[in-house]
C-alpha cells in the first residue's frame, strides 16, 4: 500500500520548476529544510583558478551583504563554493532561507550575467514553452521562494535543467549512523 505525498509537496515541485524556467541562468537549486538553507548553482563555461574563485566568492559575499544591509539584515548563512573541471566551473551559493528573497535571486542572476557574460550557461526554454507573461512568471518565482521558506517543508529537494527539461527530485533524508558499541 502506498501513500500519496501531501499536496504541498506537489505545489513546491511546480513552483521550483517555475523558478528554474523563470531564471534560465540557474543550473540547479537545492533546498535544505532541516538546515533552513537553499543552494543556488550557476555554471560558467570556463575554468576558474583558485585565485579567480576566491575573488568571485568575495565579490558575491560583498554584493549579498550590501544588498541585505539596505534592509538592515545580516545573512545567517552565506557560503560560496566552486567546483571546476577542464571546461566548466560550478559556483554554489548557499543562503539561509530566512533572509533569502526573490530580489536577492535577481541580484545573483544580474551579478553572474554581468561578470560572466556569454560564459554563463543559460539553459534554453523547452520547445513547448509558450511565451509566458513576465508578471506571472515573477509572481510564480515569488511564490516559489516563499514555498522554500515554509517551515512545514520537511523534505529536501533538488531541481535542475537538463536538455530543455526541468527535473525536480526529493532527496532521501540522511540518517545519522549509530556509533558502534565499545567493547
Regions inferred by a protein language model and the residue ranges of each:
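Structured domain cores in non-transmembrane regions
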Residues: 47-104
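Glycine-rich, aromatic-bearing surface loops/beta-hairpins
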Residues: 120-183
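Ampiphathic alpha-helical segments that act as solvent-exposed interaction surfaces
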Residues: 94-130
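N-terminal interaction modules that seed assembly of large macromolecular complexes
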Residues: 4-9, 13-68
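Intrinsic-disorder-associated interaction segments
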Residues: 5, 9, 49, 98-101, ...
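Short glycine-rich, low-complexity/disordered patches
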Residues: 28-35, 69-88, 122-141
